[in-house]
Amino acid sequence: MASSSTSISLLLFVSFILLLVNSRAENASSGSDLDEELAFLAAEESKEQSHGGGSYHEEEHDHQHRDFENYDDLEQGGGEFHHGDHGYEEEPLPPVDEKDVAVLTKDNFTEFVGNNSFAMVEFYAPWCGACQALTPEYAAAATELKGLAALAKIDATEEGDLAQKYEIQGFPTVFLFVDGEMRKTYEGERTKDGIVTWLKKKASPSIHNITTKEEAERVLSAEPKLVFGFLNSLVGSESEELAAASRLEDDLSFYQTASPDIAKLFEIETQVKRPALVLLKKEEEKLARFDGNFTKTAIAEFVSANKVPLVINFTREGASLIFESSVKNQLILFAKANESEKHLPTLREVAKSFKGKFVFVYVQMDNEDYGEAVSGFFGVTGAAPKVLVYTGNEDMRKFILDGELTVNNIKTLAEDFLADKLKPFYKSDPLPENNDGDVKVIVGNNFDEIVLDESKDVLLEIYAPWCGHCQSFEPIYNKLGKYLKGIDSLVVAKMDGTSNEHPRAKADGFPTILFFPGGNKSFDPIAVDVDRTVVELYKFLKKHASIPFKLEKPATPEPVISTMKSDEKIEGDSSKDEL
């Protein structure tokens, strides 16, 4: 029995040794194959360069492209102070007494902004010269504003999650929080007096009493839009809720009265139940009546939904109304100037049914300042008017109306969008007639079919035709495609990121190279961050490919060895013909 047990143990031991040896042999073979493949590619590259092929030197991604997220790049501009403004040295600044400036982290941020009715918060970076210059002014303002508003600062380099949440793009960025909600970016003077004046105005009583007809007539004449409350009393809970809602709005005034005669001047009937509230505008839609619970939140939502025009013309002034709105979904009409009178009344009629759910926008397609650029961003081409829904948030999805521009059709589009029944529209070049080249051409309409094919590993370059870095990289990428064309499991592809789009293909600059592993397409692609050479890209693919592959090198021609005798005649050789 012992002998049998010993034999089994010995057999298992021998089997383990054999497996280990085989595994090492396979690994050695695999490593040897990779070394051989890399040596081949390096030799090919060397040959190219020795014949005047030139080389490509890694540079920063080209950021001249415009992604138009929230149409941000319709105008080139932006803040003065951005990441990287620290390529200089300055004299050390004297110490500043910041005793009244709170230091926030993710652990105390929510409590701080929630406990202070008015909280100003600066996101800064220690290396930022503009932040350092602001420090003494900010500290002095904090001391003067004690009891009225609280000031704080956050090191964005340490609190990355908060910086990402509030989409910090440059330093310093200063926000005003009202009752725990971020309401406004401070863009005033970076001085103590500038900060104090601005904050005092924001924190001052923002609701005004009207007790005489003369006051009412003056307000109605002067104000382009206003909110008016008819209350049981000018003090107490109703007035407090209205005042709290008023602090959330910067661009219109709030008024209140307890007089039925004055209320009537503001389109409120004397017999109506109090509290009553209206929003008056000197626009096509002149009046909106509030019919919700008389609370700060409900009033603020009503005002936000009704303060904008039914349809906003996309202009410099209109853009701020669109992007500062708390409503992110946009329903957009694209039409030329000579067709706007026909279609705008239709859009306004639809807008009445979807307040608070969409911002309705009109883009004049033939307007040189904005219309042409916005139409191009959305991929709206041709002369015919079009309507589409745009999500306006990070995913930036678009849904186009396929049908006549009628009230019913546009309402159905809006309702189907809200019910998540629509298929997104992607900007796309026409499908390529022939797509059998070494590098596959991807457009918006074949992205799913090729890039998201689970049976393939796909390397995708997103480029721009005008991008110099892309032009320099093109011959290298084409060579990689040529070397790998015979590998069925691997696709080397490219997409023009200026005329095609897909939510899975996000580019922060050009060129952007993404890798989509086979069998794993539900996850985000891998950003390829290696030197842009054939060898380094090949090494990346060997490491990350879900489906193992081996480079198919061109066969080396065998040397021809002659075995003919000296007196044999070559068939068909006319030089041996008789005289």
Curated annotation (Swiss-Prot):
Q: Organism source for this protein?
A: Arabidopsis thaliana (Mouse-ear cress)
Give GO terms: molecular function aspect only.
protein disulfide isomerase activity
Which terms in the GO cellular component ontology are assigned?
A: cytosol; endoplasmic reticulum; endoplasmic reticulum lumen; plant-type vacuole; secretory vesicle
Q: Where is this site: Contributes to redox potential value?
A: 468-469
Q: Where is the signal peptide?
A: 1-25
In this chain's numbering, which residues are marked as the site (Lowers pKa of C-terminal Cys of second active site)?
532
Q: Where is the composition biased (Basic and acidic residues)?
A: 44-69, 80-89, 565-579
Broad class of enzyme this protein falls into: isomerase
Chain location of the short sequence motif Prevents secretion from ER per the record: 576-579
What is the annotated localization of this protein? Endoplasmic reticulum lumen
To which protein family does this belong?
A: Belongs to the protein disulfide isomerase family.
Read off the InterPro entries from this record.
Prot_disulphide_isomerase, Thioredoxin-like_sf, Thioredoxin_CS, Thioredoxin_domain
Its EC number is 5.3.4.1
Give the catalysed reaction(s), semicolon-separated: Catalyzes the rearrangement of -S-S- bonds in proteins
Keyword entries, A-Z: Disulfide bond, Endoplasmic reticulum, Glycoprotein, Isomerase, Redox-active center, Repeat, Signal
Q: In which tissues is it expressed?
A: Widely expressed.
- Annotated protein name in UniProt: Protein disulfide isomerase-like 1-3
- Region Disordered: what ranges? 44-91, 558-579
Per UniProt, residues of the Thioredoxin domain are: 81-204, 416-546
Q: Domain of life, per the record?
A: Eukaryota
Q: What induces it?
A: By chemically-induced ER stress response.
Q: What is the lineage of its organism?
A: Eukaryota, Viridiplantae, Streptophyta, Embryophyta, Tracheophyta
**Pfam families noted in UniProt:** Thioredoxin, Thioredoxin_6
Q: Where's the active site on this chain? A: 128 (nucleophile), 131 (nucleophile), 467 (nucleophile), 470 (nucleophile)
